[in-house]
Structure formats: structure tokens, C-alpha cells
From Swiss-Prot:
Belongs to the influenza viruses matrix protein M2 family. Residues 64-84 are annotated as: Disordered. This is Matrix protein 2. The record marks W41 as: Seems to be involved in pH gating. Cytoplasmic tail plays an important role in virion assembly and morphogenesis. Its main location: virion. The gene is M. It is a single-pass type III membrane protein. InterPro entries: Flu_M2 (IPR002089). HAMAP family: INFV_M2 (MF_04069). The chain crosses the membrane at residues 23-43. Keywords: Disulfide bond, Host cell membrane, Host membrane, Host-virus interaction, Hydrogen ion transport, Inhibition of host autophagy by virus, Ion channel, Ion transport, Lipoprotein, Membrane, Palmitate, Phosphoprotein, Signal-anchor, Transmembrane, Transmembrane helix, Transport, Viral ion channel, Virion.
Length: 97
């Protein structure tokens, strides 16, 4: 006798969905939550660069320039640029023992 004859094979009827009571409110709620979760996950993966960049950099804007004379605006921009230039030329050397 072969081992293949002793293995139980599922009948096609067992593979079919037995969701005859799909009008159950819990099943409907779970389906809606699952679909919404899938949609939000897809949107997150498609737009994550824009969303997280907005949170990371959008909230760190400089002070408002309303009512500030143009000469002071230019002075502020130059200070900010010089601070960036100093940071770009600064390197940290780490020596491992």
C-alpha cells in the first residue's frame, strides 16, 4: 500500500467559503475596517514622502516675515545662510580603538 493512498485529501466542498451568515454585523464591521485599513495603507505607501516631509520640515519654518523691512529680511537670510555654510564645513573625526 502506498503512502499517497493513506493521506487525506480535502474534498472540494471543504475549500468553499461557508459564509452563509455574512449579514452578521460583526462580519460587516470587520470587512469595512479591513477595507479602510487597506486603503489607508496604500495611500501611506504612495504618499509617505510628502506626508512625512511635511511633518518633518513643514512645522520647522522660520519666524514670520510680515511687517519686517526688506533690509532686515535680507540680513536674516544672510545670517541663516552663513550658519548653514559653517555647518557644512564642520566635520567630526571619530577614532575607533
Amino acid at each position: 500500500m502506498s503512502l499517497l493512498t493513506e493521506v487525506e485529501t480535502p474534498i472540494r466542498n471543504e475549500w468553499e467559503c461557508r459564509c452563509s451568515d455574512s449579514s452578521d454585523p460583526l462580519v460587516i464591521a470587520a470587512s469595512i475596517i479591513g477595507i479602510l485599513h487597506l486603503i489607508l495603507w496604500i495611500l501611506d505607501r504612495l504618499l509617505f514622502k510628502f506626508i512625512y516631509r511635511r511633518f518633518k520640515y513643514g512645522l520647522k519654518r522660520g519666524p514670520s516675515m510680515e511687517g519686517v523691512p526688506e533690509s532686515m529680511r535680507e540680513e536674516y537670510r544672510q545670517e541663516q545662510q552663513s550658519a548653514v555654510d559653517v555647518d557644512d564645513s564642520h566635520f567630526v573625526n571619530i577614532e575607533l580603538e
